[in-house]
């Protein structure tokens, strides 16, 4: 009963995390007339403030000494910070420049790009269904490129930057709050310097558009940290396969907002490209669930054998 309650709580946290990530396109336009770079700089500054307070409340500081003593981890943290800043900055720009649908595509194809990176960088071997999914996504990009009259570069940069970020995070092996604190700390001084420089040049929007605008810019820290905390609470309570399915909530919400709320154009060739991506994701999800089910069945079949084997006395 307790396990069921924990899993139910984890699902609620998961829905909360991916729901907030899916609805975040509604937030960034509220920060206009701030530009994408100014918003990104404030996001870095205020995220560190929020996460720093959270870590202070939780008394989780031991990791800092270990990180500072490990040059390799420091380098990977700096690299992760650079990659995620590209991802965040481009996403903010795309939402505020009427490219919400194309941005959502980036997060739809992100699992497929992660698989491709696994093959190219880590030498992983794909199952047949995974090859089919990757092939379909490649055809989808070609169809969308024809439809847009250009490669869907926003989608590709978002997908590859986030997949690269995931690869670096895998090597870092740090908790969500800790890694966010470390990454924003790396970029804190440049971000703060840029905010102060804008103020000195008379180009800052922070104090020029009233208290409400200043509070919204400061809220970028909460918008960044709260979904991450919810995701962390979900990750320890629900199976990874469930999280894998929940991750599609965010781009589904973003796509829906782009079409229904922001009224972005969806000509037939764009529908065709997205349909190919969705077909690839259905195949990928089916294959992942089938593989997980088979692995679980093998473990259950092996368990009685292990239990039935008599223990040998030490020689």
UniProtKB/Swiss-Prot annotation:
The chain crosses the membrane at residues 11-31, 37-57, 75-95, 103-123, 129-149, 180-200, 216-236, 242-262, 271-291. It holds the Pfam family EamA. Keywords: Cell membrane, Membrane, Transmembrane, Transmembrane helix, Transport. It is found in: Cell membrane. GO terms for cellular component: plasma membrane. It comes from the Bacteria. Residues 19-146 form the EamA domain. InterPro entries: EamA_dom, RarD. Its main location: membrane. The keyword Transmembrane applies. The keyword Transmembrane helix applies. It is a multi-pass membrane protein. Belongs to the EamA transporter family. NCBIfam families: rarD. This is Protein RarD. It comes from Streptomyces exfoliatus (Streptomyces hydrogenans).
């Amino acid at each position: 009963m307790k396990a069921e309650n924990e899993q139910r709580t984890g699902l609620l946290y998961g829905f909360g995390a991916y729901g907030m990530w899916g609805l975040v396109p509604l937030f960034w336009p509220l920060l206009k007339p701030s530009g994408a770079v100014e918003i990104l700089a404030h996001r870095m500054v205020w995220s560190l403030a929020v996460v720093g307070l959270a870590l202070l409340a939780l008394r989780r500081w031991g990791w800092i000494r270990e990180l500072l003593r490990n040059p390799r981890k420091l380098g990977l943290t700096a690299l992760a910070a650079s990659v995620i800043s590209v991802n965040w900055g481009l996403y903010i720009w795309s939402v505020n420049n009427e490219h919400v649908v194309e941005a959502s595509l980036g997060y739809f194809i992100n699992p497929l790009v992660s698989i491709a990176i696994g093959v190219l960088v880590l030498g992983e071997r794909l199952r047949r269904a995974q090859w089919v999914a990757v092939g379909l996504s490649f055809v989808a990009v070609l169809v969308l490129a024809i439809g847009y009259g250009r490669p869907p570069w926003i989608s590709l940069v978002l997908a590859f930057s986030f997949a690269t970020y995931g690869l670096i995070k895998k090597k870092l092996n740090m908790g969500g709050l800790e890694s966010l604190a470390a990454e924003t700390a790396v970029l804190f001084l440049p971000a703060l310097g840029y905010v102060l420089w804008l103020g000195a040049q008379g180009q800052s929007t922070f104090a020029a558009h009233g208290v409400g605008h200043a509070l919204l810019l400061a809220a970028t820290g909460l918008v960044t940290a709260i979904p991450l905390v919810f995701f962390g609470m979900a990750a320890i309570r629900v199976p990874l396969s469930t999280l894998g399915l929940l991750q599609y909530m965010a781009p589904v919400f973003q796509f829906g907002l782009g079409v229904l709320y922001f009224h972005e154009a969806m000509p037939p060739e764009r529908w065709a490209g997205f349909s190919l991506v969705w077909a690839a994701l259905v195949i990928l999800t089916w294959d992942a669930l089938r593989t997980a089910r088979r692995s679980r069945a093998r473990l259950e079949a092996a368990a009685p054998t292990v239990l039935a084997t008599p223990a040998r006395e030490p020689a």
